[in-house]
């Protein structure tokens, strides 16, 4: 009878260790990748674009985003460099997309359309190392 209890205890301990290991592996695999809004911008009407530039930071912050790059120097390695480059970081691709699709941002992106030529992308980033 004592041997049966030891075997049962061993099986239970092994099962708990297995569940704990599987949970740890799953939590590593379930890491949320950051999301980025990336824009190439050529401002055609600086005065109107300034109105957009003043309003957009509040919409970004509302979705947990922050600027990684906002203008500044650009050096071309291959191809033509954009006049202005912007990278905005979010906690996830979904948060970045939610910002882009939000009514807050939707209310002002027409200002950008009227004052600049741009290409804007939402991309999923790599996990932090």
Question: What is the role of each PLM region?
Answer:
Residues 5-10, 14-103, 124-129:
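Short S/T/G/P-rich N-terminal loop/turn motif that feeds into the first structured element of a domain
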